[in-house]
């Protein structure tokens, strides 16, 4: 089976060593596998959320495109495109926006962090918050679901967005699928071995901290940047601790095991920091020198980059265009030439049943809610260690069968295989509780034609 992998980089800055080691290099390695279908894109719509400088965005798009190619991306093996060259993506974003719950978006980490920052500053909670920031998880869901990606490589801080894409995709399937699963449920791919590099000051290398080493800066500028890496004050001849050295962590990400072992040994034997930084520069210059020349050549040929990206967009749209037509048909945005069935020709009456919504708690555990057709919460599950366990339980409930419901004063619980798996809300009295039990049984009963 071929696995489709999708990843994008937001075009708001110049690529640095952290981008390369943490995202670009592992993605290029993965793209060479015979059983992988890779979709890589420049997330320039996302960039508009973070940056209002047109020249910076334009320059960043050019630099990131050139970086991917100079680093060895084979555009004949992958689909490489700009997000803004795929008009189906914003259209799908709107279709998904119309089924995305506001409560789901309220829980997005970036939005909550912005609100919390405003509250701490005694400002209006929504001060400076745009609809772009608030709803960008829907745009990210469209990026993923447009191509039915199986896996999305992300950092741990991005797991929530993949889970939100799943929630939104499930909701669309439930409302419009009529037995068909339009969207594959994507999985977040966490690469534990992928490097998170320290910046010049020891914090995570990030444009936000202004502590980056540009990937393809000139040899002179790279040497100057490396010389500014923070180290301790131990003199040459004094033993250094590699495990607490930002310089060693950086060296480790680019060296072979043999080179790394040698560098560690020399630090323990008292190698001076000045000489250690010189070796760091030599290692990077040898590894990146040829790619730097290719990068500079591509930067000088923007028309060639444009042609490559437009060809990639055509390739991507061969997937996106017919799929979006199916989705438009599903929601009722149909051509008037499409035959419309009426009730006299045997159209079945259908009712919208209950639906399951899964989510992840801040502590990493998984839960699901069972919501009635009108949105009322019928059940809230207990916590599960992983999403698979939660999915097994919700799938069992969807299969119908006798329910083990146990009344407890002003609420009831649901049991499976001798274990309590979900709780009802608290009710005003026993009558309301018993009515809710009947509603739950009806909601989980197999649908009849």
Swiss-Prot record:
Organism domain of life: Bacteria
Motif ('HIGH' region): 11-19
EC number in record: 6.1.1.2
Motif ('KMSKS' region): 204-208
Gene Ontology cellular component annotations, sorted alphabetically: cytosol
Residues annotated for ATP binding in this entry: 10-12, 18-19, 155-157, 197, 204-208
UniProt xrefs under SUPFAM superfamilies: Nucleotidylyl transferase, YegP-like
Biological processes, Gene Ontology terms: tryptophanyl-tRNA aminoacylation
Catalytic activity: tRNA(Trp) + L-tryptophan + ATP = L-tryptophyl-tRNA(Trp) + AMP + diphosphate + H(+)
Disulfide bonds: none
Key word Transmembrane present: no
Entry keyword set: Aminoacyl-tRNA synthetase, ATP-binding, Cytoplasm, Ligase, Nucleotide-binding, Protein biosynthesis
Keyword Transcription: no
Gene Ontology terms for molecular function: ATP binding; tryptophan-tRNA ligase activity
Family: Belongs to the class-I aminoacyl-tRNA synthetase family.
Subunit organization: Homodimer.
PANTHER family noted in UniProt: TRYPTOPHAN--TRNA LIGASE, MITOCHONDRIAL
Function as written in the Swiss-Prot or TrEMBL entry: Catalyzes the attachment of tryptophan to tRNA(Trp).
Name used for this protein in its record: Tryptophan--tRNA ligase
Species this chain originates from: Pseudomonas syringae pv. tomato (strain ATCC BAA-871 / DC3000)
């Amino acid at each position: 089976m071929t696995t489709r992998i999708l990843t994008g980089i937001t075009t708001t800055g110049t690529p640095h060593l952290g981008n390369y080691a943490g995202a670009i290099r592992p993605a290029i390695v993965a793209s060479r596998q015979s059983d992988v279908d890779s979709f890589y894109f420049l997330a320039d719509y996302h960039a508009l959320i973070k940056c209002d400088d047109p020249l910076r965005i334009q320059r960043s798009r050019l630099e990131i495109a050139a970086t991917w190619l100079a680093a060895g991306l084979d555009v004949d093996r992958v689909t490489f495109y700009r997000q803004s060259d795929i008009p189906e993506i914003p259209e799908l974003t709107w279709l998904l926006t119309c089924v995305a719950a506001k409560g789901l978006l309220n829980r997005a980490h970036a939005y909550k962090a912005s609100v919390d920052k405003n509250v701490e500053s005694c400002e209006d909670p929504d001060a400076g918050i745009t609809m772009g920031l608030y709803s960008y998880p829907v745009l990210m869901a469209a990026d993923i679901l447009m191509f039915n990606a199986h896996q999305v490589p992300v950092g741990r801080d991005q797991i929530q967005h993949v889970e939100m894409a799943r929630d939104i995709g499930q909701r669309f399937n439930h409302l419009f699928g009529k037995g068909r699963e339009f969207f594959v449920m994507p999985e977040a791919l966490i690469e534990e071995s992928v490097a998170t590099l320290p910046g010049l000051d020891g914090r995570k290398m990030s444009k936000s901290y202004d502590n980056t080493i540009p990937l393809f800066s000139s040899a002179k500028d790279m040497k100057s940047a490396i010389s500014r890496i923070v180290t301790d004050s131990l003199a040459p001849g004094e033993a250094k601790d590699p495990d607490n050295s930002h310089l060693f962590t950086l060296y480790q990400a680019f060296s072979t095991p043999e080179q790394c072992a040698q560098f560690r040994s020399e630090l323990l034997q008292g190698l001076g920091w000045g000489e250690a930084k010189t070796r760091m520069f030599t290692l990077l210059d040898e590894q990146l020198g040829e790619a730097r020349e290719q990068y500079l050549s591509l930067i000088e040929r923007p028309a060639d980059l444009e042609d490559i990206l437009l060809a990639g967009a055509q390739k991507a749209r061969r997937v996106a265009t017919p799929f979006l037509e199916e989705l438009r048909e599903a929601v009722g945005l149909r051509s008037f030439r499409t035959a419309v069935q009426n009730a006299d020709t045997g159209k079945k009456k259908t009712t919208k049943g209950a639906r399951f919504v899964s989510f992840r708690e801040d502590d990493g555990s998984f839960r699901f809610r069972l919501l009635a057709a009108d949105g009322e919460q019928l059940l809230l599950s207990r916590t599960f260690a992983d999403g698979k366990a939660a999915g097994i339980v919700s799938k069992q409930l969807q299969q119908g069968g006798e329910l083990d419901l146990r009344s407890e004063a002003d609420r009831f619980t649901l049991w499976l295989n001798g274990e309590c798996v979900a709780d009802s809300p608290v009710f005003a009295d026993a009558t309301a509780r018993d009515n809710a039990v009947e509603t739950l049984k009806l909601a989980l009963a197999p649908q009849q034609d």
